[in-house]
Amino acid sequence: MSEETVPEAASPPPPQGQPYFDRFSEDDPEYMRLRNRAADLRQDFNLMEQKKRVTMILQSPSFREELEGLIQEQMKKGNNSSNIWALRQIADFMASTSHAVFPTSSMNVSMMTPINDLHTADSLNLAKGERLMRCKISSVYRLLDLYGWAQLSDTYVTLRVSKEQDHFLISPKGVSCSEVTASSLIKVNILGEVVEKGSSCFPVDTTGFCLHSAIYAARPDVRCIIHLHTPATAAVSAMKWGLLPVSHNALLVGDMAYYDFNGEMEQEADRINLQKCLGPTCKILVLRNHGVVALGDTVEEAFYKIFHLQAACEIQVSALSSAGGVENLILLEQEKHRPHDVGSVQWAGSTFGPMQKSRLGEHEFEALMRMLDNLGYRTGYTYRHPFVQEKTKHKSEVEIPATVTAFVFEEDGAPVPALRQHAQKQQKEKTRWLNTPNTYLRVNVADEVQRSMGSPRPKTTWMKADEVEKSSSGMPIRIENPNQFVPLYTDPQEVLEMRNKIREQNRQDVKSAGPQSQLLASVIAEKSRSPSTESQLMSKGDEDTKDDSEETVPNPFSQLTDQELEEYKKEVERKKLELDGEKETAPEEPGSPAKSAPASPVQSPAKEAETKSPLVSPSKSLEEGTKKTETSKAATTEPETTQPEGVVVNGREEEQTAEEILSKGLSQMTTSADTDVDTSKDKTESVTSGPMSPEGSPSKSPSKKKKKFRTPSFLKKSKKKEKVES
């Protein structure tokens, strides 16, 4: 067998190019077991191996010593960065989880159990504000332990959680003050029955809670009770004269009550006697030959009372032991030497600083909480007064330009969406604009470049109120009375009715000039002398003159349709063709007065000017038509009178005006045709070529009568249309 195994042991390693699975033989049992194992189990085994290594490193004494040495070295250098705090938390975790494994270290502060050990899941079941209450009570227990006031039994601090349900917080029996945490407190009712058990497995001391429950029942205003029986307080409680006003701390304590305490409060008579002895306002209760109890509306006030009471008892015991008797002590009068008015609310702040309300003993309690936090107790206390004052923000927008607010560092988180970023920037700009100490006015200033180009359009800019030049020298009216502009000796009811009427108009969107002020009725508004307004007025005047000059005569054919205008054009062309045919036959009829009239050389120049005159308004043509009818009547009565010059027959100038508006090319043809339109249609209206008047105008025949004014030809229906319709 040895000969068979030797070649296998001395076999060379597999080449690098060989696949991984080919390196193992398929008959190997270890390979078969690994291959048949599930993937989830394989991953779990790997994680367990990694955790085992981490646990071994954390449990090694060498690693802990190295970590503590690193923290001490960095603390000596004055480095208080976040990395040191993280290392300190790791050391606290190692110290709190493995007390028996490691020896006691010189860094005993870091080995303290944190006060605030409530996690997010634990806080969900708590009442409103209960988390902070638990942290405060646990912090008071730690302070009692640090000051050396804690005793092995009956040293309890209780707190009322809610007045409606009468639930209270108390530490479990058998837990020392240095071990109390926020989660280990037990919630009980007024009878001492457990409502909510803490993280510890210890019970509640119902005998010790009887005194607290009796005080809570007698005084509903009390929320916190601290019970002490230190040597100093027990000695003062055994003296016949009680606490003497021999020190400043004794005056700060306030009124005190004394009660003969037998150790139990089970009987109803004991509770009644305690209630009579305590009274409605007393905050200190001295239990004869036992100790003291401090009451408070808050935890801060109760600790403030017990702190000064303990100091006053220590001073009194020391003074009596050194003086030899009460007759050798100087007692202070409370009326003369009262330093402060002891109350539930005090004012905190300097003479020139902002004044704000603070509870009694709140500043002192916050200082002690900062001390515990610096020692690593992690109190979880919420500070109302920050220790480091924030820097005052600059009010001048010149020192901090607007571009600084929009600056973003590269190491910031993911980029904000553009719409949200724009909204945030708008809000910041609005806030900065509203908080600015400067006052701006919107001013219209004429731009120099635009003024040189001839455009008087102003440019809108924002200027400071001090830099704006006042356009008028008038004095502004200061409104001192809301009814300043109401006339004197008026009925208030009328004023109210007018106000309601104006409001009703505003609701209905009725625009009006509004009420006029009688005080300002005689004030004459001065005309603005600014160059921009003058230029605007001049330009407006020029535009008005241009508009007046460009006014045209109203078109008499504006109401006609395109089809009617086309028919009118065709009719004019047809008449022109008929006139051309008549002109060709004119030499054969020399006696025709209608054809000899246009060729007469003695024609009046007024008539030629009338035929070649420009556009005439319809009103003028109507006036001429009336004159024409009058002259025609006169001609019938007086046959020897001549026809007046410039008479227009059958509205010829209206047709001439329409032709010039329609087309310039047709205007010349229509003017020549219009002179003979009436002669072709009505031969009786033509002027005879017989005897001439002395002025050179042809006289009218008395036998032929003038017809009345008939409708224009374009308004009549043509014969062709009549035939088609028939």
Curated annotation (Swiss-Prot):
Entry keyword Transferase: no
Stretches for region Interaction with calmodulin: 425-444, 704-721
Gene Ontology terms, MF aspect = actin filament binding; calmodulin binding; protein heterodimerization activity; protein homodimerization activity; protein kinase binding; spectrin binding; structural constituent of cytoskeleton
One GO cellular component term noted in the UniProt record for this chain? postsynaptic density
Q: List keywords of the entry alphabetically.
A: Actin-binding, Calmodulin-binding, Cell membrane, Cytoplasm, Cytoskeleton, Membrane, Phosphoprotein
Q: Which SMART domains match?
A: Aldolase_II
Note the InterPro entries from the entry. Aldolase-II_Adducin_sf, Aldolase_II/adducin_N, Aldolase_II/adducin_N_sf
Q: Which residues carry this modification: Phosphothreonine?
A: T55, T533, T611, T675
Q: Where is this region: Disordered?
A: 1-25, 467-486, 525-726
Q: Where are the transmembrane segments?
A: none
Q: Where is the composition biased (Low complexity)?
A: 588-606, 632-645, 689-701
Basic residues composition bias: which ranges?
A: 702-726
Q: Name one GO biological process term.
A: hemopoiesis
In this chain, composition skew of type Polar residues spans 665-674
Q: Which residues form a coiled coil?
A: none
Q: Where in the cell is it found?
A: Cytoplasm, Cytoskeleton; Cell membrane
What spans are recorded as compositionally biased (Basic and acidic residues)?
566-586, 621-631
Similarity field: Belongs to the aldolase class II family. Adducin subfamily.
**Oligomeric form and interacting partners:** Heterodimer of an alpha and a beta subunit. Found in a complex with ADD2, DMTN and SLC2A1. Interacts with SLC2A1.
Q: What is known of its domains?
A: Each subunit is comprised of three regions: a NH2-terminal protease-resistant globular head region, a short connecting subdomain, and a protease-sensitive tail region.
Write out the function statement from the record. Membrane-cytoskeleton-associated protein that promotes the assembly of the spectrin-actin network. Binds to the erythrocyte membrane receptor SLC2A1/GLUT1 and may therefore provide a link between the spectrin cytoskeleton to the plasma membrane. Binds to calmodulin. Calmodulin binds preferentially to the beta subunit.
Name of the featured protein: Beta-adducin
Q: What is the lineage of its organism?
A: Eukaryota, Metazoa, Chordata, Craniata, Vertebrata
